[in-house]
């Protein structure tokens, strides 16, 4: 697998298996209590998997103690929130619009996150170990986003409201697709 290293991408490729049904049911309850959207919670839960971890003793064999991961569920959660402004605009205009591919044009949320990450990269240039990882910025910004169409307004509201989504206890910043995980 080759990708441009100069862009500082990070990719983990690990073996995975579908979640055990009992774990999946518990996870659905956890996600649904966190997201409060039954359909989205079900869809997200259906994408969760158990993954291996070479640092754990149970690595060589299938075990219910494997870590849970859900990158596809996270992408679905992000997309649902990214589309807030599109839905609001369509409702206000009562327009009939044909569906467009989701990622041809960046949404206000995507552009805001892009600017936040760029700011982070500039602020922590030369001090890479202290900068927030991208998933933290994306999660907090997505939570704080209220569907604004104007980029400046979206950034102002995101920056004002991000701190509301940082818990004083563990998990400090819950993973929306696995809320008990920090």
Predicted segments with their positions:
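Long, charge-rich alpha-helical interaction segments
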Residues: 50-110
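Generic detector of bulky aromatic hydrophobic side chains
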Residues: 8-20, 74, 137, 141, ...
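Conserved catalytic core of two-metal-ion nucleotidyltransferases
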Residues: 1-69
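Conserved nucleotidyltransferase catalytic core and NTase-mimicking acidic/glycine-rich helix/loop elements
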Residues: 81, 89-182
């Amino acid at each position: 697998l080759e990708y441009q290293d100069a862009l500082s991408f990070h990719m983990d490729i690990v073996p995975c298996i579908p979640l055990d049904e009992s774990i999946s049911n518990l996870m659905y309850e956890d996600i649904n209590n966190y997201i409060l959207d039954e359909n989205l919670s079900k869809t997200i839960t259906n994408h969760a998997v158990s993954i291996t971890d070479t640092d754990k003793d149970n690595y060589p064999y299938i075990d219910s103690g494997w870590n849970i991961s859900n990158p596809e569920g996270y992408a679905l959660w992000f997309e649902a929130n990214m589309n807030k402004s599109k839905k609001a605009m369509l409702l206000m205009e009562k327009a009939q619009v044909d569906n467009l591919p989701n990622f041809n044009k960046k949404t206000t949320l995507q552009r805001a996150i892009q600017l936040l990450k760029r700011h982070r990269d500039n602020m922590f240039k030369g001090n890479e170990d202290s900068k927030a990882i991208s998933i933290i910025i994306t999660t907090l910004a997505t939570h704080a986003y209220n569907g604004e169409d104007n980029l400046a307004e979206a950034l102002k509201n995101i920056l004002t409201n991000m701190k509301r989504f940082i818990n004083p206890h563990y998990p400090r910043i819950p993973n929306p697709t696995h809320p008990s995980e920090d």
